[in-house]
Curated annotation (Swiss-Prot):
Stated name of the protein: Arginine kinase Cal b 2.0101
Tissue spec. comment: Expressed in chela muscle (at protein level). Expressed in muscle.
The species this protein was found in: Callinectes bellicosus (Warrior swimming crab)
Record field: catalytic activity: L-arginine + ATP = N(omega)-phospho-L-arginine + ADP + H(+)
Recorded family membership: Belongs to the ATP:guanido phosphotransferase family.
Record InterPro entries: ATP-guanido_PTrfase (IPR000749), ATP-guanido_PTrfase_AS (IPR022415), ATP-guanido_PTrfase_cat (IPR022414), ATP-guanido_PTrfase_N (IPR022413), ATP-guanido_PTrfase_N_sf (IPR036802), Gln_synth/guanido_kin_cat_dom (IPR014746)
Residues binding ATP, per UniProt: 122-126, 185, 229, 280-284, 309-314
Keyword Heme: no
Principal EC category: transferase
Domain Phosphagen kinase C-terminal, first and last residues per copy: 119-356
Cystine residue pairs: 201-271
One annotated GO molecular function: arginine kinase activity
Keywords: Allergen, ATP-binding, Disulfide bond, Kinase, Nucleotide-binding, Transferase
UniProt domain Phosphagen kinase N-terminal: residue ranges: 9-91
Length: 357
């Protein structure tokens, strides 16, 4: 049972949400009085409460979603809130649906989407993973952060071939190394206000670090927003090469580190928007003609479930007609299907851009 002080804070937060008439978050939409009353006293076995779930969305009324999972159990215990939010965000992943088993499919079905190198600047595929037996950020102790980091760094140091590289802990990082990682766009910063409010940045920078291979085409973030973010990327449009590298890395890491998986929701992550496959496949792409015809761009994006962002990711502008375009769907389909949908959409956008020239 949650403590009285926690429940008092929850009541206060609920009032704040109710009063915020211009708040458009999914939290506000689905945290009805009856759901609130049903959940406000509950506590996971690791001690997480509804407050841990909603505090970021209460503090930041401009959140799009507004909830995070403090641990794996939260997705089950607070399902009356999470399930409708998940269904709404992952369009059509109903509360009775079950995410399919992991399936990377035939990796040779993926191609270079821009062999002439005229449109795609770079290609990236990432996934998130949580380590079994550990809660998510808000519930982690300093000792757990250290323990996880040592497991991750020893696992990664065993990688061979193209994946062979170096692990750089954020703790005690020299200015030179730091600058080099910033120049390569590899370094992650302490979380934004949404993550800060969710208590995702405690004991910073303990337990956080970055691994990259010698070619700088493979990257792992340890204990940023998720326990692990596994990233494969390179300049140009060779999605096939990028995807194959990611798949072999995930398979190698999984042999040594068991991942948190949920029968219904797939791979578990801190933020419910990343659940399921957790896969985000994206390109930085120059589409000057389509940039001038935003309506057409959005129409094609909608047809292939693509998300169009500005050059520097979420909440940014497209600089010089360069967009960050990725698959939007992560749940209710396989990894293969998610990336294939993105490939089909990008090929279509390039075809239309050429026709408009």
């Amino acid at each position: 049972m949650a403590e009285a002080a926690t429940i008092a804070k929850l009541e206060e937060g609920f009032k704040k949400l109710e009063a915020a008439t211009d708040c458009k978050s999914l939290l506000k939409k689905y945290l009805t009085k009856s759901v609130f009353d049903q959940l406000k006293g509950k506590k996971t076995s690791l001690g997480a409460t509804l407050l841990d779930v909603i505090q970021s969305g209460v503090e930041n009324l401009d959140s799009g979603v507004g909830v995070y999972a403090p641990d794996a159990e939260a997705y089950t215990l607070f399902a009356p809130l999470f399930d409708p939010i998940i269904e709404d965000y992952h369009k059509g992943f109903k509360q009775t649906d079950k995410h399919p088993n992991k399936d990377f499919g035939d990796v040779n079905q993926f191609v270079n989407v821009d062999p002439d190198g005229k449109f795609v600047i770079s290609t990236r595929v990432r996934c998130g993973r949580s380590m079994e037996g550990y809660p998510f950020n808000p519930c982690l102790t300093e000792a757990q952060y250290k323990e996880m980091e040592s497991k991750v760094s020893s696992t990664l140091s065993n990688l061979e071939g193209e994946l062979k590289g170096t692990y750089f802990p954020l703790t005690g990082m020299t200015k030179d190394v730091q600058q080099k990682l910033i120049d390569d766009h590899f370094l992650f910063k302490e979380g934004d206000r949404f993550l800060q409010a969710a208590n995702a940045c405690r004991y910073w920078p303990t337990g956080r670090g970055i691994y990259h291979n010698d070619n700088k085409t493979f990257l792992v973030w340890c204990n940023e927003e998720d326990h692990l973010r596994i990233i494969s990327m390179q300049m140009g449009g060779d999605l096939g090469q990028v995807y194959r590298r990611l798949v072999s890395a995930v398979n190698e890491i999984e042999k040594r580190v068991p991942f948190s998986h949920h029968d219904r929701l797939g791979f578990l992550t801190f933020c419910p928007t990343n659940l399921g496959t957790t896969v985000r496949a994206s390109v930085h792409i120059k589409l000057p003609k389509l940039a001038a015809n935003r309506e057409k761009l959005e129409e094609v994006a909608g047809k292939y479930s693509l998300q169009v962002r500005g050059t520097r990711g979420e909440h940014t502008e497209a600089e010089g007609g360069v967009y960050d375009i990725s698959n939007k769907r992560r749940m209710g389909l396989t990894e293969y299907q998610a990336v294939k949908e993105m490939q089909d959409g990008i090929l279509e956008l390039i075809k239309i851009e050429k026709e408009m020239q």
